[in-house]
């Protein structure tokens, strides 16, 4: 039987349990390698089956206990005791043979006197036994009690396991360690002269030292830092014992008195010998406890203990070393066979621990041989029952395998298994002592070892706890059991895994196994009080419904999380939350509370609502079971502790009797959180219960006090209420995003959300003893074990009572301005309807938000635009709203704008047949790259263009006038440059996930059933009919790649009249396809305004960004466009690319070193031209112009990126290269070309930087440069600031040269801000 067959059999299941219970099976396999190396070829086929037979027949099915370990050590590992050290002094400590294990405790019977309390006056409580003194008894009696007396400690090691060295050797070692102490150099402030001599003149001083080597001898030079400290001491202090050995101007006189003269300290030799004399003198004077080093103990030999190794360990290691066996003529090595055996064992252990964590049952053993007879229990909720191996399968064939390798292997294996804990308790002492020596040398004192420190803390804790509970009160608050949840209710308890932990079988996996978890019960909010809010939503005949109030549920503190993260825990999973409620209202007052645990990081109430409960506050005390089921990363929690705290928020609204005043204390809460910590994201063995039926039985009933009702909870019990109220319908709002989240009592706060969704919560009348179904849940009629943990109920499901609705965006913002737009009756494609200067409109409106922005100095919120143009499904018109942040649209555009140019600016499309497209938001940090400032326009010129994107298929009967409204909405944005949506060099694939590409609008004739295809050439330039050239922001990013592969996210929007309809199917393919192929390949049947995704399919697995090679969009009408008889208009649609999830191997960059050509100056062959060249380069990438030369400005990925973004800044290297004129003679080449940088006005040259000279024959030069200004980034083009950097190129022999070329090598970290397009002009 091989391993594959064996693992699949029932015998393998039992054998796996036995192998793991015994432990150390991997060591057993490694020892059997020795035997199998010498085995005959006939035995190899029986190796696998006999190993398992040995496990099944010989290995004992009980773990090794401490008593057996001590008995084995005393019986087989004992050796001669260490004699007293009288004559021969021990130079090092030694391991004691007792192993540091205390002896067995001896049971001893002792007698103690027990006093009998006297009976109270007037009563006789003495019945049987000893009577008290009041009733004539002795008042006490003797009682025998058996106690365990500890065995005496070992006389040689005092129970530590290590016999210390002799006292005299320890004293010598202490003195030797004192001599080896390393003292740091003095840190005196250095005089500028000393600093100069120790740095700039150091090489001269070393050469001077070699000159006087015949006087100083062959000595080692010291470091400059050491010499400078010695020179500073000599300069400021009097050193009477130093004598200069080098004859100089002053002979052999002493250098002292500290007068600051250079001749006294300049002549100090730069050697360790003479600098140590000065530094040791300084230490003797200023360092307490300093002793001058002596060479008396330099030859002291430090002996070490070495590793802990016993005789049995040596015998096993040395007895079975044999060369690998390999039969003649065969290439199979038996070691490879055993390696595969070990690897299969590791796979088996992974599977076994997964099964063991879910096993809840009993293992029965036979009384005759203590072997496993049967297994009965549940595995993952499924009942299992396994009989004895003899009853399941036949016994494997018998082979005398035991005689092959003898009894010695098994005998020694048992002893080594017993010895292993002792060896682990005594690690290699060499490394430990080296660390102690190192720390003592650095600290200069004794170190408290970790075991002794822990022992001291334990003794202190016992002392404190003994005093604390010595006179404790006997009174105790007894709570109802159903009001408390324990670990046993939520997590698995008393399972097979807990038994393994108790027997220390899996103890070694406690830190290394990624599948283990840590279960904690954390007390969060303890003294929190929920108050009645100010605002009331509605009043009914039965009561008043209040507004929501939010309470942050405190999580574990920063120190606790930091401690858990340091020991290796990565994730914290909040499984359950037990919310204890103490009502502050009179008993049976008809007031109810709807408590919802919400996730504080979502603006959608439906997604944020984790669980809700309906609580009756007429009872004094209640508990609510909540199920957050929320997992968080501890690392991010440590980085943003505030975000971690607000992850769980309690939302409460009240309904009941009227008359409650705002600020009234309603109830107090104490939240207990059941958390499970995981070391990795691997999955692991969770301890959550698969079924909570047992908990429901314990916490439900007529006489119970727990009240649970709501959604996402296990069940609901309604009892003890005198009257059933009808809780009214209301809109549950998400947690507002203002920082920090506090109680909303006392002031109504407006949610600062760009877009939020509320959740409609309806009456609870029909939900007695059942969950409240909501839209995102499925049928909860089955058992809880069949569904997600804790999200199902055993109650019958009924009709849903929750629906969702969009919040009104117009009521949530602050008015900024409004603009009136006229729409002609017969609007044409590209017609400019309006041009709105946003700054001017905001200032002219003089709204309240404008005043706030004037006070703040900048626009601190994004603008949400609402087009009030009434929807019309039959006109077939689409309006483009183009936000031109940097004034890229040319000034000559007045009445019409070509769509090829307009779509490069990523317009927002308002389709009149779709009312959802009438609202959109402009993100200033994303599009502008900065926040708009009211103190001036700066770089940005925010303008909103309104353009008709299509011709009206059905004209209006009259001109339409509508309003465009702007609201300030959302979170407050940071002042200054953007902190997100920044593109940084080198361009990465992450930047492609958020690009907006508006493909050209396309038309399909009525009745046309043919497919339309066009290539995915996203990086090519767009050229209009008038000759204007345009590149989009996406083209700038994609220009850095020759091609891309991955998944494209897009959507299709139909702009034609509702009279014209069709059904389209879209696919990505690289060749012509048929209808049958289209139906079988990946495709999307597109609906209007629905985001779809397709993977790029082409013969090259990628598509080219330039040209038409690669994949193509194939649009096939599954139903050809159709319209009424009198309607002859075409179907108009457009495709918008939202982003690309690129596949890294499929994306090829165009330039690995990020070097791009900027421009070239070509001198015309005209002798009348000036011979002087003066060219000034600004600190911004732009088109260069020079009157006396022909300039070629190159187009490349870097130039397109600078033109299609708002601003850029960063460091680079400018590479200059030039060519000589053919008519120039070498004898005339006597000039140079100068390159120098500066700042400020370049005509004045007030501030100069670097200066480089290049000869005509050198032909190239590289100069570092940085693009930017005092404001940080700069725009492409425009008028340079006076305070910008510049680089000037000058030569008086321009006639020698033919051309001058400049390349830009972009360095990592170069940044781009904002999104735009360019150049939008007609080439000259």
Curated annotation (Swiss-Prot):
SUPFAM superfamilies (alphabetical): Positive stranded ssRNA viruses
Superkingdom field: Viruses
Name this protein carries in UniProt: RNA2 polyprotein
PTM note: Specific enzymatic cleavages in vivo by the P1 encoded 3C-like protease yield mature proteins. The N-terminus of the coat protein is blocked.
A cellular component annotation (GO) from this entry: host cell cytoplasm
GO biological process: transport of virus in host, cell to cell
InterPro entries in alphabetical order: Nepo_coat (IPR005054), Nepo_coat_C (IPR005305), Nepo_coat_N (IPR005306), Viral_coat (IPR029053)
Record's signal peptide: none
Family: Belongs to the nepoviruses RNA2 polyprotein family.
UniProt-listed Pfam families: Nepo_coat, Nepo_coat_C, Nepo_coat_N
Intracellular or extracellular location(s): Host cell junction, Host plasmodesma
S-S bridge residues: none
Keyword set, alphabetical order: Capsid protein, Host cell junction, Host cytoplasm, Host nucleus, Transport, Viral movement protein, Virion
Predominant cellular place of this UniProt entry's protein: host cell
Organism this protein belongs to: Grapevine chrome mosaic virus (GCMV)
GO MF annotations, alphabetized: structural molecule activity
Note: Virions are comprised of 60 copies of the coat protein.
């Amino acid at each position: 039987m091989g391993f594959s067959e064996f693992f699949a059999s029932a015998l393998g299941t039992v054998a796996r349990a036995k192998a793991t219970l015994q432990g150390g099976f991997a060591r057993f396999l490694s020892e059997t390698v020795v035997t199998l190396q010498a085995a005959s070829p006939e035995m190899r086929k029986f190796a696998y089956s006999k190993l398992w037979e040995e496990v099944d027949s010989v290995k004992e099915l009980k773990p090794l206990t401490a008593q057996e370990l001590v008995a084995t050590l005393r019986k087989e590992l004992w050796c001669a005791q260490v004699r007293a050290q009288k004559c021969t002094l021990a130079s090092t400590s030694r391991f004691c043979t007792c192993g540091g294990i205390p002896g067995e405790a001896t049971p001893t019977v002792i007698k103690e006197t027990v006093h009998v309390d006297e009976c109270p006056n007037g009563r006789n409580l003495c019945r049987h036994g000893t009577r008290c003194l009041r009733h004539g008894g002795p008042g006490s009696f003797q009682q025998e009690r058996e106690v365990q007396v500890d065995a005496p400690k070992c006389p040689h090691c005092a129970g530590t396991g290590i016999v210390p060295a002799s006292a005299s050797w320890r004293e010598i070692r202490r003195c030797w360690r004192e001599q080896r102490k390393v003292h740091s150099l003095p840190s005196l402030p250095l005089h500028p002269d000393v600093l100069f001599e120790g740095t700039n003149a150091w090489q001269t001083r070393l050469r001077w030292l070699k000159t006087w080597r015949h006087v100083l001898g062959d000595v080692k030079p010291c470091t400059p830092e050491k010499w400078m400290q010695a020179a500073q001491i000599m300069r400021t202090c009097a050193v009477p014992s130093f004598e200069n050995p080098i004859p100089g101007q002053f002979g052999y006189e002493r250098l002292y008195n500290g007068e600051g003269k250079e001749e006294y300290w300049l002549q100090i030799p730069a050697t360790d010998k003479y600098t140590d004399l000065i530094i040791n003198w300084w230490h003797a004077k200023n360092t307490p406890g300093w002793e001058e080093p002596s060479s008396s103990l330099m030859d002291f030999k430090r002996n070490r203990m070495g590793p802990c190794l016993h005789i049995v360990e040596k015998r096993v290691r040395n007895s079975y070393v044999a060369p690998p066996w390999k039969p003649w003529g065969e290439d199979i090595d038996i070691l490879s066979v055993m390696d595969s055996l070990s690897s299969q064992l590791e796979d088996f252990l992974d599977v076994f621990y997964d099964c063991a964590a879910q096993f809840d049952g009993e293992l029965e053993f036979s009384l005759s041989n203590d072997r496993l007879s049967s297994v009965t229990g549940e595995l993952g909720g499924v009942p299992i029952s396994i009989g004895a191996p003899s009853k399941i399968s036949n016994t494997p064939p018998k082979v005398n395998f035991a005689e092959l390798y003898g009894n010695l292997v098994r005998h020694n294996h048992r002893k080594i298994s017993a010895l292993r804990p002792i060896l682990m308790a005594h690690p290699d002492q060499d490394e430990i002592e080296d660390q102690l020596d190192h720390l003592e040398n650095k600290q200069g004192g004794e170190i408290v070892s970790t075991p002794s420190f822990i022992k001291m803390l334990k003794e202190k804790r016992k002392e404190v706890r003994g005093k604390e509970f010595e006179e404790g009160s006997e009174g105790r608050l007894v709570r109802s059991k159903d009001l408390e949840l324990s670990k046993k209710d939520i997590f698995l308890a008393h399972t097979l895994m807990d038994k393994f932990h108790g027997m220390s079988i899996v103890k070694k996996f406690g830190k290394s196994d990624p599948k283990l978890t840590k279960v904690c019960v954390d007390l969060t909010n303890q003294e929190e009080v929920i108050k009645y809010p100010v605002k009331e939503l509605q009043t009914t005949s039965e009561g008043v419904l209040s507004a929501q109030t939010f309470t942050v549920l405190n999580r574990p503190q920063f120190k606790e999380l930091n401690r858990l993260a340091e020991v290796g825990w990565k994730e914290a999973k909040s499984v359950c939350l037990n919310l204890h409620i103490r009502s502050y209202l009179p008993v049976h007052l008809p007031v109810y509370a709807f408590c919802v645990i919400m996730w504080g990081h979502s603006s959608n109430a439906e997604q944020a609502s984790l669980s809700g409960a309906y609580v009756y506050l007429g009872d004094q005390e209640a508990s609510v079971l909540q199920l957050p089921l929320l997992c968080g990363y501890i690392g991010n929690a440590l980085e943003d502790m505030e975000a971690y705290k607000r992850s769980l928020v309690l939302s409460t609204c009240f309904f009941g009797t009227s008359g409650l005043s705002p600020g009234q204390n309603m109830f107090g809460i104490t939240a207990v959180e059941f958390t499970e910590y995981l070391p990795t994201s691997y999955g692991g063995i969770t301890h959550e219960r698969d079924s909570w039926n047992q908990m429901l039985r314990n916490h439900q009933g007529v006489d119970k006090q727990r009240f649970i009702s709501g959604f996402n909870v296990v069940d609901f019990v309604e009892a003890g209420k005198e009257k059933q109220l009808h809780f009214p319908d209301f809109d549950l709002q998400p947690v507002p995003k203002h920082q920090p989240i506090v109680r909303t009592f006392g002031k109504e706060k407006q949610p600062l959300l760009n877009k939020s969704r509320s959740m409609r919560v309806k009456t609870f009348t029909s939900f007695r003893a059942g969950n409240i179904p909501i839209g995102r849940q499925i049928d909860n009629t089955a058992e809880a074990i069949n569904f997600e943990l804790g999200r199902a109920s055993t109650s019958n499901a009924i009709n849903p009572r929750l629906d969702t609705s969009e919040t009104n965006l117009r009521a949530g913002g602050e008015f900024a301005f409004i603009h009136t737009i006229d729409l002609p009756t017969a609007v044409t494609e590209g017609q400019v309807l309006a041009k709105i200067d946003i700054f001017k409109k905001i200032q002219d409106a003089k709204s309240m938000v404008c005043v706030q922005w004037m006070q703040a100095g900048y626009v601190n919120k994004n603008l949400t635009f609402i087009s009030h143009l009434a929807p019309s499904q039959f006109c077939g018109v689409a309006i483009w709203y183009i936000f031109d942040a940097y004034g890229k649209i040319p000034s000559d555009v007045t009445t019409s704008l070509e769509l090829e140019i307009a779509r490069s600016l990523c317009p927002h499309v308002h389709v009149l047949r779709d009312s959802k497209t009438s609202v959109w938001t402009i993100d200033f940090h994303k599009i502008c790259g900065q926040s708009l400032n009211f103190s001036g326009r700066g770089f940005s010129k925010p303008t909103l263009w309104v353009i008709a994107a299509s011709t009206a298929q059905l004209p209006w009967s009259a001109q339409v006038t509508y309003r465009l409204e702007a609201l300030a909405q959302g979170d407050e944005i940071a002042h200054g440059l953007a902190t997100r949506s920044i593109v940084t060099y080198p361009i990465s694939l992450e930047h492609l996930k958020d690009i907006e590409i508006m493909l050209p609008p396309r038309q399909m004739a009525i009745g046309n059933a043919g497919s339309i295809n066009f290539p995915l050439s996203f990086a090519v330039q767009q050229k209009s009919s008038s000759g204007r050239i345009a590149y989009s922001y996406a083209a700038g990013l994609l220009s850095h790649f020759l091609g891309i592969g991955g998944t494209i996210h897009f959507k299709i929007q139909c702009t034609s009249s509702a009279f014209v309809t069709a059904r389209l199917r879209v696919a990505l393919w690289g060749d012509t396809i048929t209808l049958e192929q289209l139906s079988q390949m990946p495709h999307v049947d597109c609906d209007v305004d629905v985001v779809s995704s397709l993977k790029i399919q082409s013969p090259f697995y990628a598509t080219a960004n330039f040209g038409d090679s690669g994949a193509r969009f194939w649009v096939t009408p599954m139903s050809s466009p159709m319209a009424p008889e009198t309607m002859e208009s075409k179907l108009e649609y457009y495709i918008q690319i939202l982003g690309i999830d690129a596949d890294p191997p499929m994306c090829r960059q165009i330039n690995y070193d990020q070097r791009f050509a900027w421009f070239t100056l070509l001198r015309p062959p005209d002798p009348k031209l000036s011979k002087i060249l003066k060219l000034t380069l600004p600190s911004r990438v732009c088109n260069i112009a020079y009157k006396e030369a022909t300039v070629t400005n190159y187009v490349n990925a870097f130039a397109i990126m600078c033109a299609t973004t708002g601003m850029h800044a960063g460091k680079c290297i400018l590479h200059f290269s030039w060519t000589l004129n053919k008519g120039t003679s070498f004898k005339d080449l006597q000039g140079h070309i100068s390159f120098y940088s500066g700042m400020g006005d370049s005509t004045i040259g007030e501030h100069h930087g670097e200066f480089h000279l290049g000869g005509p024959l050198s032909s190239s030069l590289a100069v570092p440069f940085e693009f930017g200004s005092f404001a940080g980034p700069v725009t492409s083009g425009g008028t340079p600031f006076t305070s910008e950097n510049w680089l000037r190129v000058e030569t008086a022999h321009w006639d020698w040269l033919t051309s001058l070329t400049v390349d830009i090598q972009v360095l990592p970290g170069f940044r781009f801000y904002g999104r735009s397009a360019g150049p939008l002009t007609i080439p000259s």
